[in-house]
């Protein structure tokens, strides 16, 4: 998890903000929309190389039906939908649930941009934390999570500072 009130932007994160200053973000309750489903399908096929086409039912079950307060964040370049993020709004934190983007727009670093937006949004809501979900040290697709500091890892049911406990990072029980 990332502490929202003490978060510090890195130089590359500043560049990512600059690169995406033209984007508009809209907040919506979870609901099916065809352009969102098409973007999800494209993302799964091209980014994760999913061999099986996704169905509307898969999309609804995974991302639309939620037992907690959830918002969908739509990221637009003018009228073109580039990305969608899902966040859960909890009493003391926001939880970044999932994020999809147009793989053709990968150079924009939309995933990084979305987390920067979510940190700022959590701060506006006076939520001290943005939860980034599990962190797997050896997963290149999750390595970006360690770039958001200060952060804490959940280890043995206790939150510990990310960089003060490097010996924990090799453990399989570590999540961020």
Regions inferred by a protein language model and the residue ranges of each:
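Terminal substrate-recognition subdomain of acyl/acetyltransferases
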Residues: 1-22, 124, 128-176
């Amino acid at each position: 998890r990332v502490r929202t009130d003490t978060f510090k932007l890195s130089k590359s994160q500043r560049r990512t903000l600059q690169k995406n200053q033209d984007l508009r973000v809209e907040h919506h309750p979870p609901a099916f929309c065809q352009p969102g489903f098409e973007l999800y399908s494209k993302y799964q096929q091209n980014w994760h190389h999913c061999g099986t086409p996704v169905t509307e039912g898969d999309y609804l079950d995974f991302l639309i039906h939620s037992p907690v307060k959830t918002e969908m964040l739509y990221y637009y370049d003018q009228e073109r939908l580039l990305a969608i993020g899902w966040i859960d709004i909890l009493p003391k934190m926001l939880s970044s649930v999932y994020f999809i983007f147009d793989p053709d727009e990968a150079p924009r670093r939309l995933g990084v941009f979305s987390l920067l937006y979510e940190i700022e949004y959590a701060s506006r809501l006076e939520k001290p934390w943005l939860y980034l979900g599990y962190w797997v040290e050896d997963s290149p697709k999750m390595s970006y999570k360690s770039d958001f500091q200060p952060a804490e890892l959940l280890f043995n049911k206790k939150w510990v500072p990310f960089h003060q406990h490097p010996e924990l990072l090799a453990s399989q029980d570590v999540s961020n």
